[in-house]
């Protein structure tokens, strides 16, 4: 049905206004969004986070209203509403909701951080309530007396008493006991000894008052900690997976608990004392860590301590695959150590990860192994949880080595189409204490291609195809550069959010000229086309960041839709481009890197998502899906029964040279030896939609085939989307020839290199059992041969999850 206007409006049900404990009224605005098909009907549902207008950054004091997440059908039917509860503060850094089909059932789930008080309400299509249910708290927490009625949101008086309790227990703190922190609170504040330890309640309160009224303001006049209220620094924290229908599937403890109110995290160490700041910085993402299935990534911390955990949810239960913890950054004085952002954590392996993260993450296959990695700002985590790199550089003095450090914006994409792999464009916040203010880096190694030192915090950057006359994407902060670092004489576009809108595969920006005047309502423009959309009557989010609710290719023509809230928050407007295009390309949501990016776009400082391929007017479409633009090759590794034979050897024939007749019937087949193959018996069969490359050789076992370099030859040519059929056993079983012999109990391991060669190149390995030796019984029934080798192959195939063909089966 054609749209009546230039947009579609998805009706919303706005939560009721509220009042904080301080008597401050607040109202709600539709904020971040995500999409997922919750019922497998082929149509996305729309997930909307509601933020109160008093939602806060983690560094800002004050109460907030509750946060809600709704799930809507496209017609506006409310499927469910998740009330995050009283113990989840509202703000960009607290609630990252990952919408994806995590269990592979064809329906999207949602993973999100929860707490006591989080409650789900599910609705019937007519709006009546089907159920209202709190999340399931672990039995250990119920036994400890926690309940959904608990409220851990602090008042100013609560915080005063909390600090008194911290001081009263000072002598028992592990850092004090181990001699790493001053033995007394007075020493931390630079005071002469005044009190006996352990402190009594009165002395602890006296020190708390001194801290609030004297010490903290002396560090910075902005440290008005008598007004510290609205934060949560106590109580359980959970990670919950909800089904698309709103049913709770599993709840576990959130990985890496807060431990304290930020004291160990460095929240009291800087001149600006900001309790509950660094400790409550969360990120989340989705990554195909094994190249085949989606995993949830849950993160906490990036200014100092950095932690990440990876979970699979394949069996409707969280299963932790790996965890990473930099450890806390050591401080000589937790109340005065401004170098904590620059130091490393205590973990001997992951310590250098500390302080390197951003306000978002990216997930992409940056090393070309078919598995996705996590780009954590200036660091990268390999798919197996190992640290790929954490980047350091040299300051302008030429001597001092420093970490790249935290940054606010990052883009991971194929920026330079003439350089293999992906690139990263990043800004960095540490100013004069960091080697770069911005840099373009190689994604696989993290090495800088070009960049500049900057003494100030650079908060934004962007990439995109904005100059049709320059090869590659362009990158910009203050100036615009090409992929080689050459400054282009172009006006600098906005840096809030990119969008693919035009029909010429160029890049547009959603803030543009209107952002410069402070009236943010999602204007789309670029340097070539000018203003392309003015969505009047709408509003963007997150203050000066001017974020739409979502930018994603939700309708499926390889351009992106702009999803923004109406100014009165009664609807989400979905704008789609009507610009004609001569290009054909699949929906971007079918590119795994892009689809995962749509899931993590709602992280903190919303960042654009990019496909895994170079997206621009000068793109080579053959590089988009190379496995679909080239014929797959079926490689064959085996012995005499599979081998191709020369005309002089006839009538001897191996089944490998006859396979093409079964693969594509009477199709014309061109058979020839591959020119670069060093083995003369190899034969290549070219069919209209398939190539069969038969590398089998008589007299070879799985062992000698490898030792002669025949598998190496296959590995040098096999590509993603190819197949490798492996069939050995006859010669492996020949005890009389030791050079060939492989015992049956070692046969599986002898096959493993074949599996590894295929798997590492994105190909599929298929195992076929030894062919029977024409041994018939009196009834004329052929008996399978080499049973032990057949079963060993079957077992190995089952172990690695490879297809197995029993050639001896009836």
Residue ranges and their predicted role:
Residues 53-54, 87, 116-118, 640-644, ...:
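Solvent-exposed loop/turn segments at secondary-structure junctions
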Residues 709-810:
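Alpha-helical cap/lid subdomain in secreted, periplasmic
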Residues 1-626:
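Beta-propeller-forming repeat regions
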Residues 72-76, 238-248, 682-689, 753-765, ...:
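A structural motif corresponding to the C-terminal end of an alpha-helix
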Residues 627-696, 712-720, 724:
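Serine-esterase "nucleophile elbow" of acetyl-processing enzymes
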Residues 17-22, 55-57, 643-648, 701-704:
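Short, solvent-exposed loop/turn elements at domain surfaces
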Residues 47, 111, 373, 633-638, ...:
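Structural recognition of the beta-strand scaffold that forms the well-ordered cores
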Residues 95-96, 698-714:
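Charged, often glycine-rich, active-site loop that binds/positions anionic groups
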């Amino acid at each position: 049905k054609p749209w009546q206007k230039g947009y579609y409006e998805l009706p919303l049900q706005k939560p009721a206004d509220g009042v904080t404990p301080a008597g401050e009224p607040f109202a709600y605005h539709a904020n971040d969004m995500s999409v997922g098909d919750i019922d497998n009907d082929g149509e996305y549902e729309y997930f909307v986070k509601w933020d109160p207008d008093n939602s806060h950054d983690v560094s800002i004091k004050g109460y907030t209203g509750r946060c809600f997440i709704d799930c809507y059908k496209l017609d506006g039917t409310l499927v469910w509403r998740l009330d995050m509860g009283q113990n989840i503060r509202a703000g960009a850094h607290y609630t990252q909701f990952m919408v994806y089909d995590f269990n592979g059932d064809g329906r999207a789930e949602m993973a999100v951080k929860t707490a006591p008080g989080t409650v789900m309400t599910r609705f019937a299509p007519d709006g009546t309530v089907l159920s209202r249910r709190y999340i399931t708290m672990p039995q250990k927490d119920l036994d400890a007396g926690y309940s959904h009625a608990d409220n851990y949101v602090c008042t100013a008086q609560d915080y005063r008493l909390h600090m008194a309790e911290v001081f009263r227990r000072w002598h028992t703190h592990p850092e004090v006991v181990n001699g790493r922190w001053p033995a007394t609170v007075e020493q931390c504040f630079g005071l002469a000894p005044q009190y006996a330890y352990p402190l009594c309640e009165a002395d602890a309160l006296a020190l708390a008052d001194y801290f609030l009224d004297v010490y903290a303001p002396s560090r910075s006049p902005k440290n008005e900690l008598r007004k510290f209220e609205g934060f949560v620094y106590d109580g359980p924290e959970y990670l919950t997976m909800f089904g698309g229908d709103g049913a709770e599937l599993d709840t576990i403890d959130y990985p890496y608990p807060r431990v304290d109110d930020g004291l160990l995290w460095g929240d009291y160490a800087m001149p600006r004392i900001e309790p509950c700041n660094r400790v409550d910085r969360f990120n989340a993402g989705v990554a195909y860590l094994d190249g085949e299935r989606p995993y949830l990534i849950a993160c906490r911390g990036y200014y100092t301590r950095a932690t990440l955990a990876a979970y699979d949810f394949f069996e409707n239960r969280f299963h932790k695959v790996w965890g990473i913890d930099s450890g806390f950054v050591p401080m000589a004085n937790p109340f005065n150590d401004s170098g904590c952002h620059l130091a490393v954590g205590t973990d001997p392996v992951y310590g250098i990860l500390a302080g390197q993260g951003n306000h978002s993450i990216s997930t992409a296959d940056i090393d070309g192994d078919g598995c996705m990695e996590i780009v954590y700002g200036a660091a990268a985590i390999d798919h197996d949880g190992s640290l790929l790199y954490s980047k350091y550089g040299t300051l302008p003095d030429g001597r001092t080595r420093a970490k790249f450090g935290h940054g606010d914006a990052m883009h991971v994409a194929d920026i330079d189409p003439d350089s293999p792999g992906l690139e990263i464009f990043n800004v960095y916040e540490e100013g004069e204490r960091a080697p770069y203010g911005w840099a373009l880096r190689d994604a696989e190694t993290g090495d800088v291609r070009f960049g500049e030192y900057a003494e100030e915090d650079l908060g934004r950057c962007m990439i995109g195809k904005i100059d049709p006359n320059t090869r590659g994407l362009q990158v910009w902060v203050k100036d615009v550069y090409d992929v080689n670092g050459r400054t282009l004489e172009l006006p600098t576009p906005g840096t809030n959010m990119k969008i693919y809108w035009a029909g010429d595969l160029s890049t547009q920006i959603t803030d543009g000229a209107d952002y410069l005047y402070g009236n943010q309502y999602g204007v789309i423009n670029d340097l070539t086309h000018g203003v392309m959309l003015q969505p009047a009557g709408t509003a963007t989010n997150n203050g000066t960041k001017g974020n739409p609710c979502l930018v994603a290719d939700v309708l499926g023509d390889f351009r992106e839709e702009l999803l923004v809230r109406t100014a009165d928050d009664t609807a989400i407007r979905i704008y789609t481009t009507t610009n004609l295009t001569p290009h054909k390309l699949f929906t971007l949501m079918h590119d795994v890197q892009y689809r995962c990016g749509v899931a993590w776009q709602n992280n903190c400082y919303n960042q654009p998502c990019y496909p895994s391929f170079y997206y621009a007017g000068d793109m080579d479409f053959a590089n988009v899906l190379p496995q679909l633009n080239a014929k797959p090759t079926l490689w064959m590794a085996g012995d005499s029964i599979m081998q191709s034979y020369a005309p002089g050897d006839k009538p001897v024939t191996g089944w490998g040279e006859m396979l093409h007749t079964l693969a594509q019937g009477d199709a014309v087949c061109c058979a020839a030896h591959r020119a670069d193959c060093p083995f003369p018996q190899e034969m290549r069969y070219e069919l209209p939609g398939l190539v069969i490359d038969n590398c089998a050789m008589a007299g070879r076992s799985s062992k000698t085939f490898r030792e002669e370099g025949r598998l190496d030859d296959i590995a040098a040519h096999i590509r993603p989307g190819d197949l490798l059929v492996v069939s050995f056993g006859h010669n492996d079983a020949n005890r009389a020839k030791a050079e060939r012999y492989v015992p049956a109990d070692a046969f599986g391991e002898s096959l493993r290199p074949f599996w590894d060669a295929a798997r590492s190149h994105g190909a599929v390995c298929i195992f076929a059992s030894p062919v029977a030796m024409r041994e018939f019984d009196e009834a004329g029934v052929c008996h399978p041969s080499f049973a032990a080798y057949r079963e060993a192959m079957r077992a190995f195939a089952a172990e690695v999850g490879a297809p197995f063909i029993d050639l001896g089966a009836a």
